[in-house]
Amino acid sequence: KEFAELMNEKAIELGLTNTHFVTPHGLDDANHYTTALELAKLTDYAMDNETFAKIVGTKSTTIYINNQPRQINNTNELLGVLNGVVGVKTGFTNNAGRCLVTETKRNNMDIITIVLGADTKKDRTKDSVNLIEYTFSKYKMYNL
């Protein structure tokens, strides 16, 4: 509970007025909520932390428990597959559905896409790919 309070303090500091945390794990609770826009803002902030960015950008790694190796894999199906994807996080609860926050870097552009409430993993991935490809095909960076 104390950690969730710290999370709420950070949300206020970041100007996230439509976000409230109850638990650190994000499982369903009526008072635990956010918006796609505020998830994007939070992701932008979090990805500036090198340790966080490295963790969410790692496809797989081996950890040791009682001197026994155990491989853990990132559940973001786009990481290491779709050009420019550098992270971030999948999620699922019964109320939220299947969710995916993705950061992609291409052609001097850095975008964050948010998919919430997908029915299946396949839909979540397809919707994310469509958002990413649409954005990079329709928007360009210009020097002013």
Task: Give the role of each language-model region.
Residues 19-25:
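Short beta-strands and strand-loop turn motifs
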